């Protein structure tokens, strides 16, 4: 079994890379790929860079060059669930874009033309992620909708609009749906696991800087426990 892991920033992948046995680092198009073994499985940890285009490029290269059986997206997110706090985890049941609007042509809000409205995370991986969280027992978690866009959300007006458009949204971030779209087109099973670094409000920039490392560590622990259970 070969598993690809994608995180946007160094703090989101550092713990995973440090845990690899026999790591081998390569770069393609400025994107860093670290191959190694984790819990007896072949793993490729990918630091994609921030945003949808960077994530799509990294995912395409990961699948094309390394052919993983599964793709796991890990990292931080802004939370939209009242019962969760910074450091808690959202497991994506599906991912959508919050900044796409081609409704003039009959598509749903957030649906890219000629694409499904949502990119559904693999049920086996979602269940494995839930089991991993239960095994660790360190943080609260929910499984639900994660929305993606090329903006850091800290404006109450924008937050309210997103909640109106996607009332079941559990978290927002900047890569997951792009990764989901590429995996969909390659027919590669995927899941998105995000630890909350902020609550998508006026305090988000301060919270994000303060809690990014904590969120990245929590998310990495979930990923490692998930891989152990596969």
From Swiss-Prot:
InterPro entries, alphabetized: MTA_SAH_Nsdase (IPR010049), Nucleoside_phosphorylase_d (IPR000845), Nucleoside_phosphorylase_sf (IPR035994)
MF-aspect GO terms = adenosylhomocysteine nucleosidase activity; methylthioadenosine nucleosidase activity
Its pathway, per UniProt, is: Amino-acid biosynthesis; L-methionine biosynthesis via salvage pathway; S-methyl-5-thio-alpha-D-ribose 1-phosphate from S-methyl-5'-thioadenosine (hydrolase route): step 1/2
Gene Ontology, cellular component aspect:
cytosol
Catalytic activity, reaction form: S-adenosyl-L-homocysteine + H2O = S-(5-deoxy-D-ribos-5-yl)-L-homocysteine + adenine; S-methyl-5'-thioadenosine + H2O = 5-(methylsulfanyl)-D-ribose + adenine; 5'-deoxyadenosine + H2O = 5-deoxy-D-ribose + adenine
> One of this protein's GO BP terms?
L-methionine salvage from methylthioadenosine
**Keywords per UniProt:** Amino-acid biosynthesis, Hydrolase, Methionine biosynthesis
> Pfam families, alphabetically?
PNP_UDP_1
Protein name, as recorded = 5'-methylthioadenosine/S-adenosylhomocysteine nucleosidase
**Gene for this protein?**
mtnN
């Amino acid at each position: 079994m070969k598993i690809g892991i994608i995180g946007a920033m160094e703090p989101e992948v550092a713990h995973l890379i440090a845990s690899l046995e026999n790591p081998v680092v390569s770069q393609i198009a400025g994107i860093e790929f670290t191959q190694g073994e984790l819990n007896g499985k072949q793993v490729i940890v990918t630091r994609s860079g921030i945003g949808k285009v960077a994530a799509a490029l990294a995912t395409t290269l990961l699948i094309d060059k390394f052919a993983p059986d599964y793709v796991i997206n890990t990292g931080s997110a802004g939370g939209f669930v009242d019962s969760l706090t910074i450091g808690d985890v959202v497991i994506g049941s599906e991912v959508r874009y919050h900044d796409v609007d081609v409704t003039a042509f009959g598509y749903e809000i957030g649906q890219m033309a000629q694409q499904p409205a949502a990119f559904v995370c693999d049920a086996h991986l979602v269940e494995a992620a839930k089991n991993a969280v239960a095994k660790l027992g360190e943080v609260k978690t929910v499984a639900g909708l994660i929305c993606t866009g090329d903006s850091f959300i800290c404006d109450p007006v924008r937050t309210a609009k997103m909640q109106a458009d996607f009332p079941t949204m559990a978290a927002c971030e900047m890569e997951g749906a792009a990764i989901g779209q590429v995996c969909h087109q390659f027919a590669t099973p995927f899941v998105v696991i995000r630890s909350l670094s902020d609550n998508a409000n006026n305090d988000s920039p301060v919270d994000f800087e303060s809690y990014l490392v904590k969120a990245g560590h929590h998310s990495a622990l979930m990923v490692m426990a998930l891989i152990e259970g596969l």
